[in-house]
């Protein structure tokens, strides 16, 4: 925010430090001064100060910043004069304001002023505004901008005659403060027409019964006034509004509209509702000075939850404060500092009873008070000292160690780790075949940055597949993986899972299975097996996998993930030209099963013999079924069976596929003769042919 040096000086008794020195002090004790420049023919200096979000509620104003400067420089603060509001009798129809929700509008205050004069502002106020980048328009509009920049409370002025309703009747006029409906239109003071999102705060007027006129939106509350009620040179009566609006609602609306104002930026950080009347009293005091004149004929003040905005009391233990700061601290010095920040302090034995002003929303516990004391004293004045504490080795984080091992294993296999957003959007539902039930289990983001980030991801695979889609033209094969959290609804609760997913573009089921075996072996998991894929809604979605080329990964009956090829439907939707193999593992379950114990098997000193076998089986037959039959028939002398080819296509009967295996025979205590190997191999052939649907090809 831009601050005028001359303007700040008005609220300080005594001379401020030179502009450069003041900037240095603010940098050391409060906020970063991002820029310092001269303005207005070198009569003033402008400080561009980066007010931190946790102090925006009280320091996005010249009086707020002056209060900080007074505390830092040990100077006295002199606040601007206000004027007690006096209501006089007038001829205007009274105003009634209805607020839809006190959560959305904690306080609504306004002054109805009759008989104002619209004209040019005095030179001094025009110069003040222009110094900080605000154009002077007329005395009423300049008043609202000046009060906002001085006090931190945004104001807005309505032309009261432009608010629909009876003008001079006892019935009065009516304004409603409510949430907008989706798509409602409003034209703002700067001639922009907005189609409003649902939930935006708006103010509408209410024409008199029988007038035939519809209700109109006259204000985008907290952000920008409506054009229909704008102040003009012919304005005679004004409604001067100072309200307190819900910070989250204003922030969401300005983000959705991609439109903001200085008032909206202030409201979006939440401010003290008690500021509204203070700002109106200050505005009333300036009306005569700015030539506005007029008389107040009505005060509106809706503040139903005023009790919840009372001052807070915090007990500060002096011994605690000294130990945190690392310096001896007297009660007297602590009291002086806190009082300079507008706190009220009462001394007790070894404690301070501190009453914090309502504007300081950031002061909630004694640690906050210690921080305030520390920064005003100056962190640079606190002597550096080495911490005195026993040096103990950190505890072993088993989860991180196993995760590092998994990452290294995948990188060793040629995979690249990627990091994606934790979101998916509406456009992902169709290509990834989300059903209505799938969508219900997604976690919707309340305030998404865009439609592309409308939901939290329920799987890592979708974004990985989009990575493949965007990079497939650059290379023949892609190997990527991601570690991250997924989110879903299950039985009325939010479930968050830590997952690992890997993709091989131009890869097959068996290639991915080999990767999975390598990872599991590296984690000491030897009891893994693969079962027919039967995805449940809380674990994965069947629609993303290729039916017949996917499997569940199990360890001792515990499901730990899925692997297989991505369905042709998804490939077509994403325009992927090659098949994609995928692996999806639950890291939490996987790490619980991992073991550092590695069993060592002495390799045989005797040579092995290899035989090949080709078997014609029905298309739906699982490879594991055939391998189990061969292992059972061969006994302990069958050291390994590997599938090296699977053929489906021409020259085979319909509904059939050909499986080709290497069978390795080996003994640990002797060299097997050819006759022994042939006998074992024939046993396996016989066992296979016992199944009438299987045929050994010779």
Task: Give the residues covered by each predicted segment.
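His/Asp/Glu-rich mid-to-C-terminal helical/loop segments that flank catalytic regions of hydrolases
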Residues: 273-290, 461, 467-478, 678-684
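Class II aminoacyl-tRNA synthetase-like tRNA-binding/catalytic domains
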Residues: 176-207, 215-231, 381, 388-496, ...
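Broad gene-expression machinery/nucleic-acid interaction feature
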Residues: 44-48, 92-94, 108-110, 174, ...
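A carboxyl-terminal module marker
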Residues: 2-3, 340-349, 493-495, 506, ...
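Short beta-strands and strand-coil junctions in structured, solvent-facing domains, enriched
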Residues: 55-57, 227-228, 247-248, 360-362, ...
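RNA/tRNA-interacting regions in translation and RNA-turnover enzymes
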Residues: 1-379, 383-399, 404, 506, ...
């Amino acid at each position: 925010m831009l601050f005028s040096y001359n303007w700040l000086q008005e609220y300080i008794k005594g001379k401020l430090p030179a502009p450069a020195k003041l900037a240095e002090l603010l940098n050391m004790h409060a906020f970063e001064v991002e820029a310092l420049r001269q303005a207005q023919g070198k009569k003033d200096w402008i400080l561009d100060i980066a007010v931190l979000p946790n102090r925006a509620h009280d320091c996005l104003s010249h009086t707020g910043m002056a209060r900080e400067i007074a505390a830092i420089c040990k100077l006295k603060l002199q606040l601007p004069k206000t004027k007690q509001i006096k209501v006089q009798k007038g001829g205007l129809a009274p105003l009634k304001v209805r607020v839809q929700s006190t959560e959305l509008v904690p306080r609504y205050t306004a002054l109805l002023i009759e008989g104002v004069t619209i004209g040019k502002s005095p030179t001094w106020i025009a110069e003040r505004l222009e110094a900080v980048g605000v154009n002077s328009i007329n005395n009423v509009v300049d008043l609202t901008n000046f009060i906002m920049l001085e006090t931190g409370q945004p104001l807005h002025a309505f032309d009261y005659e432009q608010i629909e309703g009876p003008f001079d009747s006892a019935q009065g006029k009516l304004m409603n403060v409510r949430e907008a409906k989706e798509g409602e239109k409003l034209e703002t003071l700067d001639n922009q027409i907005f189609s409003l999102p649902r939930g935006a705060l708006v103010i509408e007027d209410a024409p008199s019964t029988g007038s035939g006129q519809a209700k109109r939106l006259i204000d985008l509350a907290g952000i920008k006034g409506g054009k229909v009620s704008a102040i003009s040179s012919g304005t005679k009566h004004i409604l001067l509004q100072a309200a307190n609006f819900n910070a989250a609602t204003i922030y969401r609306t300005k983000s959705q509209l991609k439109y903001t104002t200085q008032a909206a930026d202030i409201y979006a950080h939440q401010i003290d509702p008690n500021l509204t009347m203070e700002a109106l009293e200050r505005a009333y005091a300036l009306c005569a000075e700015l030539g506005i004149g007029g008389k107040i004929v009505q005060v509106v003040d809706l503040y139903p939850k005023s009790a919840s905005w009372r001052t807070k009391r915090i007990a500060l233990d002096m011994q605690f404060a000294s130990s945190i700061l690392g310096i001896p601290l007297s009660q007297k010095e602590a009291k002086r500092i806190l009082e300079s920040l507008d706190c009220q302090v009462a001394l007790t034995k070894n404690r301070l009873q501190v009453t914090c002003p309502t504007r300081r929303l950031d002061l909630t516990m004694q640690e906050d008070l210690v921080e305030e004391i520390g920064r005003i004293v100056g962190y640079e004045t606190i002597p550096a000292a080495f911490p005195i504490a026993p040096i103990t080795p950190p505890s072993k984080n088993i989860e991180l160690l196993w995760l590092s091992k998994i990452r290294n294993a995948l990188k060793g296999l040629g995979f690249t780790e990627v990091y994606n957003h934790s979101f998916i959007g509406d456009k992902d539902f169709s290509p990834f075949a989300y059903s209505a039930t799938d969508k219900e289990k997604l976690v919707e983001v309340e305030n998404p940055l865009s439609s592309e980030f409308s939901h939290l991801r329920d799987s890592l695979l979708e974004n990985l597949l989009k990575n493949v889609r965007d990079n497939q033209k650059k290379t023949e094969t892609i190997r990527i993986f991601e570690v991250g959290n997924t989110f879903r609804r299950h039985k009325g609760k939010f479930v968050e899972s830590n997952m690992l997913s890997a993709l091989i573009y131009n890869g097959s089921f068996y290639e991915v299975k080999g990767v999975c075996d390598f990872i599991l072996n590296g984690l000491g998991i030897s009891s893994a097996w693969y079962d027919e894929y039967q995805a449940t809604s809380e674990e994965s979605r069947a629609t993303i996998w290729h039916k017949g080329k996917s499997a569940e990964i199990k360890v001792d009956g515990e499901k730990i993930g899925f692997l297989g090829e991505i369905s042709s439907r998804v490939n077509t939707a994403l325009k992927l030209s090659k098949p994609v193999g995928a692996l999806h593992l639950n890291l939490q379950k996987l790490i619980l099963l991992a073991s550092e114990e590695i069993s060592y098997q002495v390799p045989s000193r005797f040579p092995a013999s290899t035989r090949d076998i080709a078997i014609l089986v029905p298309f739906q037959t699982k490879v594991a079924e055939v391998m189990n039959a061969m292992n059972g028939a061969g006994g302990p002398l069958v050291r390994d069976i590997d599938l090296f080819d699977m053929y489906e296509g021409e020259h085979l009967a319909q509904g059939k596929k050909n499986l080709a295996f290497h069978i390795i025979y080996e003994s640990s205590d002797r060299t097997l003769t050819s006759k022994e190997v042939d006998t074992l191999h024939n046993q396996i052939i016989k066992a296979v042919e016992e199944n009438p649907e299987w045929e050994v090809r010779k």
